[in-house]
Structures are given as C-alpha cells and as structure tokens.
A protein has these predicted regions:
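Metal-coordinating catalytic core of metallo-dependent amide/deamination hydrolases
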Residues: 67-171
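Generic, ordered loop/turn and secondary-structure boundary motif
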Residues: 2, 22-25, 102
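Histidine-centered catalytic micro-motifs
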Residues: 1-6, 171
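Alpha-helical scaffold segments that flank or form the walls of functional sites
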Residues: 7-94, 124-140
Length: 171
C-alpha cells in the first residue's frame, strides 16, 4: 500500500508543516486507516506492472494491513493477502507474501491507535492469519508464504523466540 503514498510524505523545505525523519509515518498511517481491499489490489497491480516493466520477476511483499476499517478480522482472514496474490497473478509476477506480525508500539509500549489495522491480538492470532494465507496461496500459481515480524520494537522478545521455534518445528 505504501506505493500509493509516493510523494505524500515529501515536503518542500519551506513548507509550514514540520518535516523530520518520522513525519512520513503520519502520511502512511493516514493512508493505512483508509485503504480498502479493492484499493490494495489496484495499488499492488500498479506496482507489480511497473516492477515487471523494469525486469523484476519476483516480489517479496511484507504485508502489514490485516484488519478492516473497524479493526476486526475480515471474514476471510486472508482477504487482503488474497487481493495482493490476485494482483500478482493478474500481471504475471511471482510472489512471496510475508504477513507481518506486529503487537506493540515500541519496547514494552502499547500500540498506537494508528497502528490498529496492523496488529495481531496474540501470537496464536498471527499463526491463524499465516495459516489462512498459506491456504489461500494454494489457489494461485507462483505464490509462496513466509513469516515475518515488524521489528524488535514491534514484537516482544518472547514472541520472537516463539516465532523462531515455530519456524524450525521446535515449538
């Protein structure tokens, strides 16, 4: 979805609005809180067409938005991931979709309200999302699924360890 915000976070030095390293987040959150499934699909298709035009044949999509505008899970937990897979297949690019696990707003901090569409309510909730995305991916050619965390700030250390154990089959 961030492809759609190109230019929205860039300010001329004489702009009245404060502009610093983190000010792009305001634009990103504003877009994330409005974008709908059909927008996600259209944005992804535009980006993937451009990537193909420049010679890329595979994209790894770090996918953050998992919840609807009311912060509920979609009926199809993989709804937005499926929109991305559909876009990739429609333009003919190979896809590895990586649903991102995000649970906190910083080291030991609660999430900000602007982050609500990115959040998994628990590690188990994230695993359910990832399983739904894996099931969805079987319907599309050249679609793989990975695991990912936002960062050490965005996921508690114990859940990072659980993720690693889960990926290696040691959970």
């Amino acid at each position: 979805f961030q492809y759609a915000m190109a230019g929205l976070a860039e300010l001329h030095p004489t702009a009245m609005k404060k502009n610093d390293f983190w000010s792009w987040r305001e634009s990103m959150y504003a877009l994330a809180l409005k974008v709908q499934p059909e927008h996600i699909e259209a944005i992804a298709a535009m980006l993937y067409k451009e990537m193909l035009r420049h010679g890329y044949t595979h994209v790894a999509e770090f996918h953050y938005i998992h919840r609807d505008l009311n912060v509920s899970s979609y009926e199809n937990k993989a709804e937005l991931s499926e929109r991305i897979a559909r876009a990739a297949q429609s333009v003919g690019i190979n896809l590895t979709i990586i649903p991102i696990y995000y649970e906190q707003g910083g080291f030991g901090l609660p999430p900000q309200k602007e982050q609500r569409r990115f959040l998994s309510s628990s590690f188990e909730d994230y695993l359910e999302l990832n399983a739904a995305v894996k099931t969805m991916a079987t319907k599309y050619e050249n679609c793989e699924v990975g695991f990912g965390i936002h960062s050490m700030r965005g996921v508690a250390l114990d859940n990072i360890i659980e993720m690693a154990k889960h990926r290696t089959g040691n959970s």
